[in-house]
Curated annotation (Swiss-Prot):
Bilayer topology: Multi-pass membrane protein
Protein name: Golgi to ER traffic protein 1
Coiled-coil annotated spans: 76-116
Cell location: Endoplasmic reticulum membrane; Golgi apparatus membrane
HAMAP family reported in the protein's UniProt record: Get1 (MF_03113)
Native source species: Candida albicans (strain WO-1)
Main location: endoplasmic reticulum
Cytoplasmic-side segments: 32-115, 178-199
Cross-referenced PANTHER family: GUIDED ENTRY OF TAIL-ANCHORED PROTEINS FACTOR 1 (PTHR42650:SF1), TAIL-ANCHORED PROTEIN INSERTION RECEPTOR WRB (PTHR42650)
Length: 199
């Protein structure tokens, strides 16, 4: 076997944690997580183009403030000089923005790959390598035979609970719990109004 022989409770807990993380990602949203990763990258990165972009943006703001403070009719030469400087800064900012957007795209791809590796890959590995592992047993006689048979699907003897049923149960519980927690914060739906017929 390629993977180590794990204790059933280790598999049980690790799959539970992976499914909880997967539900958290689904609830929060990949785009929100990617935006958070990008903001963290902006804070910790020593990338020169980001620093240049921030300084040029501040410089453009100052130039526009000075431009608004003077009258174009009274001080035409100074206003024109500031206007040219603002146009030049805007062009430089646009070029830097394209570079930064390319970096953001690569950061988004990396964070998307990390989310995929953390939430999907462990589930598929467990499904392939631990599908015949008995996670726990149910005492005989608690459920009817057909329920024991369903709980043992797809590869286990009656009375055993395997990975497939465990994942199904955990997914159901975690998604219902997530719904209960997020429901009060969901956007409120307005009460429908009946259309009145005009005759």
């Amino acid at each position: 076997m390629l993977l180590p022989d794990l204790h059933p409770y280790t598999i049980l807990l690790s799959i539970f944690l992976v499914l909880v993380v997967k539900q958290l990602v689904a609830t929060i949203g990949k785009s929100t997580i990617q935006e958070f990763v990008w903001l963290v990258y902006l804070k910790v990165s020593s990338n020169q183009s980001i620093k240049t972009y921030n300084s040029k943006q501040h410089e453009l703001h100052e130039t526009n403030r000075q431009k608004r403070a003077i009258s174009a009719q009274d001080e035409y030469a100074k206003w024109t000089k500031l206007n040219r400087q603002a146009d030049k800064l805007s062009a430089e900012l646009q070029k830097l923005n394209q570079e930064i957007q390319q970096q953001k795209s690569s950061i988004d791809k990396a964070s998307n790959a990390l989310i995929l590796v953390l939430t999907t890959l462990p589930i598929w590995i467990a499904r392939v390598f631990y599908r015949k592992t008995h996670l726990f047993y149910i005492r005989q006689g608690i459920f009817p035979k057909y329920v024991e048979w369903v709980l043992a699907l797809p590869f286990l003897p009656n009375g055993a609970v395997g990975l497939t049923i465990w994942m199904f149960a955990v997914n159901s519980v975690v998604s219902n719990f997530s719904f209960l927690v997020s429901f009060p914060f969901a956007k409120r739906v307005s009460k429908p109004v009946r259309d009145t017929k005009v005759e």
